[in-house]
Design a protein with these regions (language model features):
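Divalent metal-cofactor coordination and adjacent catalytic microenvironments
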Residues: 1-95
Length: 95
């Protein structure tokens, strides 16, 4: 995800907290790998990764978000779906 895409997701202007947003973007691939098992090399192929990344950025950037429980449930559901996708990649490599 680019800084421009992240700013669009967060509804902020580029230049507003760019360093913070960039650090959150940098954390996404490793976080997704740890939580789902989906390797970063496969993350670009999965459309759900971009969706999950947007929700994660929103949760992390707006830590005091009033609707964080609904957001967390959505993130949990997407994480489970990507975990299944990661297993598919794992099984295809083993063949």
């Amino acid at each position: 995800m680019t800084l421009s895409e992240a700013c669009n997701v967060l509804h902020v202007n580029e230049g507003d907290n760019d360093e913070l947003i960039a650090s959150l973007i940098d954390a996404l691939p490793d976080y997704i790998e740890v939580t789902t098992g989906l390797l970063p090399i496969h993350q670009d192929e999965e459309p759900l990764v971009k969706t999950l990344s947007g929700f994660l950025l929103t949760l992390w950037y707006y830590a005091d978000h009033s609707d964080d429980q609904a957001l967390t449930r959505t993130i949990d559901a997407l994480t489970k779906a990507l975990t299944l996708k990661a297993r598919e990649y794992e099984n295809n490599v083993d063949l």
